[in-house]
């Protein structure tokens, strides 16, 4: 079963493959907004994370996280409800394969969480985020008619269309502010770097959700030149380099960062 469900809350989630089966990917939760925002604030103010991210505001404040989480909860509410209905319907039939699964246009599984145990029972902690959205073709010259044309075409393709180009990442909109991203904001807490978690998170999102439930055929991603960890994540998931764009990201004085170059990667299919 690609999508798992908490038997008590009926929350849908993805589970990472071994040896990371204690890591799950869930939607954001209304009852954990403050806790998750605090975890986000800690990670996104760490130079081992924010150095490689163009979009999130810096310094990142708890209210930024709360606004973001509330937005994502609303965006994914319908998908989460549909999945819970699927779970309930399948539970009432002897053969779960009798129910046809819907095709969706978004991935509600954003929160990378580590599941632990304490005296009160099972708990989990937010340790990162992963997002899957329609690709923005940010390698094309900004504010050009070519960019507007390809973005409009990709956006207008109907749900499940095989020609949709997707990307790992997201565009951040916080309150009345707009932060235009030119590469993904996926991140992992530095306390969990170097353990293969993000590689397996990408694998789970692609294999267990994007391909079977979004009919995904085309996927691209990018990373800042010098980010060795991100390159490894892509390569382990069968991505190949298709281009390098020098000085593509503007200076970020708040982070004391100059212009940065990006590498575009393209997915070559399931391994």
Segments the model singles out, each with a brief description of its role:
Residues 78-101, 106-113, 129, 165, ...:
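Short hydrophobic/aromatic beta-strand element in the GNAT-like acyltransferase core
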Residues 68-76, 97-99, 118-119, 235-240:
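Short, charged low-complexity intrinsically disordered segments located at boundaries
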Residues 32, 61-64, 104:
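Soluble or luminal CAZymes and related metallo-dependent hydrolases
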Residues 41, 57-61, 224:
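Generic, well-ordered alpha-helical segments
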Residues 48-95:
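Conserved GNAT-fold acetyl-CoA-binding loop/helix
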Residues 1-32, 36-37, 43-48, 111-271:
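Acyl-donor (CoA/ACP) binding surface of acyl/acetyltransferases
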